[in-house]
Amino acid sequence: MTGSKDYVVADISLAGWGRKELDIAETEMPGLMACREEFGAKKPLKGARITGSLHMTIQTAVLIETLKALGADIRWASCNIFSTQDHAAAAIAEAGIPVFAVKGESLEQYWDYTDRIFQWADGGLSNMILDDGGDATMYILIGARAEAGEDVLSNPQSEEEEYFYAQVKKRLKASPGFFTKQKAAIRGVTEETTTGVNRLYQLQKKGLLPFPAINVNDSVTKSKFDNKYGCKESLVDGIRRGTDTMMAGKVAVVCGYGDVGKGSSASLKGAGARVKVTEVDPICALQAAMDGFEVVTLEDAAPTADIVITTTGNKDVVTLDHMRSMKDMVIVGNIGHFDNEIQVASLRNLKWTNVKPQVDMITFPDGKRMILLSEGRLLNLGNATGHPSFVMSASFTNQVLAQIELFTKGEQYQNQVYVLPKHLDEKVARLHLDKLGARLTELSGEQAAYIGVTPQGPFKPEHYRY
């Protein structure tokens, strides 16, 4: 591991490799490159001090350098202990941007790195957060509540929370008053994923959201593309790299049929698997059934499944009892944000055999074995390299526009959760059409008037469901 005052990466000598992949990724990320061209001279993020907590991949490196080109100062960590691509982190460190991310870092290191992205060399404070899953945001908010005298650190509910609370206590002791000052300095947060967005909406509902937030996840050009088409390519990639299993003919159970579940089901179906879906929502269940999938309960499907994948963003979706009922050598994995979709903690007293990084074989008392991918964390990033660059360009272009919006116009926003306006969603999509050779048909003035829009758009009302 290579560490200094300004970065911690696995091996700084990987920077050259990372830079080569960055150069390739830029050609697949037209939205971000267009942002550099449009905003680079104006530097709308000059003065922004962005704390970023998002998977430290090659694609994220292109995002980071785009934010830098637009004037921002940045400190970055990964939002998952397994998702870092070490050569990407090295390239960013070599470019002089503080980054703290190592593939396979411990939970203790994870929360230490989350703390370090708020610790600026000049002793100043962050004024923006770019988050994925909400950990950076929650770190500051929980710390501020503890400083205010609330009893929020005494009862951790998981191993993750134990390390989280320990790091908060460490910072409380080292820098009294830090969290309260840091919370007050934040102009806004932009949140990447479903899980983090849910946390923000819960804070808003309770009146505990202390700054404006933009829900990037629910931009159409994020959720309907990254969540669906990204998973469609990266899920099977992760399973194959982790297990080398043949998926054709196998029975795969996908828990959840939201956007991630839809992409995951399509991914497995495309690989030839016989896919079954579990759902709690009757609308999503009906969609799955009419897309040709058998809708089942996990209790019924677990004994015959060869592959079980969770996609829900909920907890305890796959329980110990479910896993006990599964066949020998079943493959179990998760593509939702946190590791608690699968009751991994309940397996810790069993025999674990590490096959290779992020692949473990767990043996039950009756001799049955289970292959667990990435310890129940995001397998597409732990066992593979995540979504392709092109689809991440759409997601990250939304992030750039959201950061500009909150940093430059933050006073126009209340302490609520917002989504980007429709015209920006359409702009993001438009920026990616040329790369695919797609040409838009143009409305005449008469046609536009007939359906109540302008020829330039927006073309759909806010309530339209794509």
Curated annotation (Swiss-Prot):
GO terms for molecular function: adenosylhomocysteinase activity. GO terms for biological process: L-homocysteine biosynthetic process; one-carbon metabolic process; S-adenosylmethionine cycle. Pathway: Amino-acid biosynthesis; L-homocysteine biosynthesis; L-homocysteine from S-adenosyl-L-homocysteine: step 1/1. Its main location: cytoplasm. Binds 1 NAD(+) per subunit. The keyword S-adenosyl-L-methionine does not apply. The keyword Hydrolase applies. NAD(+) binds at residues 193-195, 227, 256-261, 279, 314, 335-337, 380. PROSITE patterns: ADOHCYASE_1, ADOHCYASE_2. It comes from the Bacteria. Keywords: Cytoplasm, Hydrolase, NAD, One-carbon metabolism. It is found in: Cytoplasm. Pfam families: AdoHcyase (PF05221), AdoHcyase_NAD (PF00670). NCBIfam families: ahcY, PRK05476.2-3. May play a key role in the regulation of the intracellular concentration of adenosylhomocysteine. This is Adenosylhomocysteinase. The gene is ahcY.
